[in-house]
């Protein structure tokens, strides 16, 4: 959360050029599951290269031990309870989802001229009004 706050705080600072960056958010991954953190069992050459050539943040903590609440926290910069995503993982039959009026990191980055995208598992609502296309 500290990093996300710092990132959003620094978005308004002038810069010669804006850096490109990728946030990789995975479920059920342990610290030692990547080669760049010492795994010899699981081969992760592309992520290892990103870690070697870019910046690695090693002290990030998640706001929840399960995917939907921790995903909501990363995307909004808020505690899961604040955005109503604190109770459980959202499954396809769930009627709740991330409120589309919440401002996400993508919204803030878009305001600063960044092109943003989200690939893979959304898991923050399965109904049209809670999907990221909104």
Q: Predicted segment positions?
A:
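Hydrophobic h-region of N-terminal signal peptides that target proteins for export
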Residues: 6-16
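Formylglycine-dependent sulfatase
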Residues: 2, 15-134
């Amino acid at each position: 959360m500290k990093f996300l706050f710092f990132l959003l705080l620094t978005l308004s600072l002038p810069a010669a050029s804006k850096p490109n960056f990728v946030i990789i958010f995975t479920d059920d991954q342990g610290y030692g599951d990547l080669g760049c953190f010492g795994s010899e069992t699981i081969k992760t050459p592309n992520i290892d290269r990103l870690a070697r050539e870019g910046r690695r943040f090693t002290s990030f903590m998640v706001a929840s031990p399960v995917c939907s609440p921790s995903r909501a926290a990363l995307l909004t910069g808020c505690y899961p309870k604040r955005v109503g995503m604190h109770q459980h993982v959202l499954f396809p039959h769930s009627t709740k989802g991330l409120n589309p009026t919440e401002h996400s990191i993508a919204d803030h980055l878009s305001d600063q001229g960044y092109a943003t995208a989200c690939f893979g598992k959304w898991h923050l609502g399965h109904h049209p009004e809670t999907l990221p296309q909104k």
